[in-house]
Amino acid sequence: SVPDCGTGPGLIIGQEIFGVNKTMRQIADYFAEEGYVVLVPDMFWRLTERVELAYNEKDFKTAFGYFGKFDLDLAIEDISISMDKLKSLDECTGSVGYMGFCLGGKLAYLTASKLEPEVAISFYGVGIPEMLDQGNNVTCPMIFHCPELDEWMPPEGVKALRNAFESRDDIEIYDYPGADH
């Protein structure tokens, strides 16, 4: 998605386990309206192309199957390629951030620790507490959005996240009481 003004900073949107579905496209369009050049890469392309699942029990099982086969290292390579591609576009003014949801939220954390985005934002990222050893490698400002009732990031995980980054002024963690994944 490209803003009406034609140019802007780059933003990569990291998909949930449901693929590049209507919700991810709507988020991309919203941020394009706000002035960003947005790319939503298909992170499941190695498993099957164009995964677009709904938020129902049947599709959740399918999504979880893809998630179980997902290779994080290859995903980071794909994100690196996506960042380079976005930066090369005439429409992109050069800086690129990464914002992800669920699986994409986990990838936001890994992108911040392994690549060099301008900023990274994680919405209900899964499995981050198990990867806190990567925290010293985060080189950009980062925001974590953590729902209180998220079974994939329980309160003890959020506490560990806070403890890991308590000395970092450039990392913010927001809680959402009563909210679920």
Please annotate each region the language model reported.
Residues S1-H181:
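N-terminal cap/leader regions of alpha/beta-hydrolase-fold enzymes
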